[in-house]
Amino acid sequence: MKNWKFNKINYPTFEKSGAIPRSITKTFEKLKKELNPHSESEIIEEFTISRYQTIASLRYLIVLVVFPVVVHQVSKNFIIGPAVDYFWKYNQIDVFLNSSQEERAFAELQRFEEKIHFEMLIGTKQSVSQQSLEASIKQKAVEIADHYTYESLHAIKNILADSISISVFILLIVLGKRQTFVLKSFLNEIVYGLSDTAKAFLIILFTDMFIGFHSPHGWEVVIESLLRHFGLPENRDFIFLFIATFPVSLDTVFKYWIFRYLNQVSPSAVATYHNMNE
């Protein structure tokens, strides 16, 4: 199987439309194949190649997903984690990595103090001395400091571990060019082998989810989570600028893909998409 030529692998993705309709061309190809005296052996060979393509693609896809995740968890928990904890402990680094953490910590401590005063005023909490009140606030401040110390450590570990796992993923892609080619052909065959209605449904689902009317709220949550994941300041100007530009760029690329590729490969799917989107 390793000696098979790649031109035997099916890739119906980029068939260009010509003067003769594709349906007529496929009908003649089917008739020619049925009249071929060696058609039975060719069908068996095509089935064998298709089976090899499916097994190889699924195996490589599992490797691409599982191996970087395993490397990420192992490196983070057994190599990067202990090293970062040791460095942080013996260098007495500040609790906060950015101003956003400080603002959240101060707001949380302020809410705690205001809650105590409010409960004392309405009588749900017994009045305590100023010394006891300061002790409670101090204890809460220590808890908040421990929480944000853990968050800062976690962010540094995420940056290093994610960098390693991304490097491993890129290395797998670079070293597995043959497997990548087979996987790409396999995925193209699945996507472009869907019915026109299924294609149109997936297109509408994708566009409404990522570039639709409600997508800015989702993008805001995603960007804030990513910034917090890497310990970066949650700059509102950057978030709003990203939301204002990236979905528009994504929409432009998507429309170009429909015009440039999908319109040639499956014009009926494009027509179905426009009808469903109206």
Swiss-Prot record:
One of its GO terms (molecular function) is proton transmembrane transporter activity. It is found in: Plastid, Chloroplast inner membrane. Pfam families: CemA. The keyword Ion transport applies. The gene is cemA. GO terms for cellular component: chloroplast inner membrane. It catalyses: K(+)(in) + H(+)(out) = K(+)(out) + H(+)(in). It comes from Cyanidium caldarium (Red alga). The chain crosses the membrane at residues 61-81, 155-175, 203-223, 238-258. The keyword Ion transport applies. Contributes to K(+)/H(+) antiport activity by supporting proton efflux to control proton extrusion and homeostasis in chloroplasts in a light-dependent manner to modulate photosynthesis. Prevents excessive induction of non-photochemical quenching (NPQ) under continuous-light conditions. Indirectly promotes efficient inorganic carbon uptake into chloroplasts. Belongs to the CemA family. This is Potassium/proton antiporter CemA. One of its GO terms (biological process) is potassium ion transport. Keywords: Antiport, Chloroplast, Hydrogen ion transport, Ion transport, Membrane, Plastid, Plastid inner membrane, Potassium, Potassium transport, Transmembrane, Transmembrane helix, Transport. The lineage of its organism: Eukaryota, Rhodophyta, Bangiophyceae, Cyanidiales, Cyanidiaceae. InterPro entries: CemA.
